Curated annotation (Swiss-Prot):
Lineage, uppermost ranks: Eukaryota, Metazoa, Chordata, Craniata, Vertebrata
Keyword Transcription regulation carried by entry: no
Topology of the protein relative to the lipid bilayer: Single-pass membrane protein
A Gene Ontology term for the protein's cellular component: plasma membrane
Post-translational modification: Glycosylated.
Main location: membrane
Designated name of the protein: Transforming growth factor-beta receptor type 3-like protein
Biased composition (Pro residues): 268-277
Signal sequence coordinates: 1-17
InterPro entries to which the protein is assigned, alphabetical: ZP-C, ZP-C_dom
Length: 297
């Protein structure tokens, strides 16, 4: 039983049958605490010199230009940045579905891709390019995927140090930084897709559809169509003129009613009354004579 236990302890990784024997150090190329910190940054913008941009996904209309900036999270005099492959897909995973390839091997794979000069001549840790977001995918949210790695800057001091230092048993070292024209000429070696130095960064893009402009009116050829000026907005009325207009309308209505009353009073026929009496100066009726016995004669 004791022998079996000792054999199991000897086979366990990280343990030794002899006490006091130090553990083997990790290889320099093995993953360590430095991988927890971000090494690169990928930013998008709708203008060439609008870096850094506000937080949040980029929102651009379809068939417009998108500007990309890839940079090292911490600039270093020894390390530079190299772009290997960039593509646009409708999925957040770069390996699923169709893709619009923009860069392949660090060189433009689309006609609309153009590299911009770095913000400073000595800024080897920043790489900028732009492309036209063609309406290839029917998706409102698309994703830009870029494979980025670090590269060694050219330095004579660094080359002498490499020659004097023995080569350890580590993964392949990063490539040397080369200018864009020299890298696309085929003079540089490309990293494999499973290289530990490659890092994939993804940024979302919100694609909007612009509204169509109104069609111009038909006109005779050779005549320029001038746009109609916009109608002036009605001015707000002040309260004083409104009150004056109301009072004037009231007075005018009262005067009109009074005038109509006078006209009706003078043009109406007189009311019927008793028959007129006979005048004293006119002929009077004579009574018949009365006799003594009270009879008329």
């Amino acid at each position: 039983m004791v022998g079996t236990a000792l054999l199991l302890l000897a086979l366990l990784p990280g343990t030794s049958s002899k006490h006091g024997t130090p553990r083997a150090p990790l290889l320099p190329g093995a993953p360590g605490p430095w991988l927890r910190r971000p090494l690169f940054s990928l930013e998008l913008s709708d203008a060439e010199d609008a870096f850094p941009r506000r937080a949040g996904p980029l929102e651009v209309p379809a068939d417009s230009h998108v500007f990309v900036q890839a940079a090292l999270a911490r600039p270093s005099p020894r390390w530079g940045l190299a772009l290997h492959r960039c593509s646009v897909t409708p999925s957040s995973r770069p390996t699923l579905g169709p893709a619009l390839v923009l860069l392949r091997g660090g060189c433009p794979a689309d006609d609309s891709v153009s590299f911009s000069p770095p913000p400073r001549p000595d800024a080897a840790s920043v790489s900028r390019f732009s492309f036209r977001l063609r309406p290839v995918f029917n998706a409102s949210v698309q994703f830009l995927h870029c494979q980025i790695s670090r590269c060694r800057r050219r330095s004579s001091h660094h080359r002498r140090a490499v020659r004097l230092t023995p080569v350890p048993l580590t993964p392949p070292a990063p490539l040397r930084c080369l200018p864009q024209d020299e890298a696309c000429a085929g003079s540089s070696l490309s990293l494999g897709t499973d290289s530990p130095h490659l890092h994939m960064l993804t940024q979302p893009i919100v694609v909007t559809i612009p509204r169509p402009s109104p069609r111009p009116s038909k006109s005779l050829p050779g005549r320029s169509v001038h746009p109609e000026p916009p109608a002036p907005a009605p001015a707000a009325l002040e309260p004083a003129p409104v009150v004056a207009l109301v009072l004037a309308a009231f007075v005018l209505g009262a005067a009109l009613a009074a005038g109509l009353g006078l006209v009706c009073a003078h043009s109406a026929p007189p009311p019927p009354g008793p028959p007129p009496r006979a005048s004293l100066s006119g002929p009077q009726l004579q009574r018949p004579p009365v006799g003594r016995d009270g009879t008329t004669q």
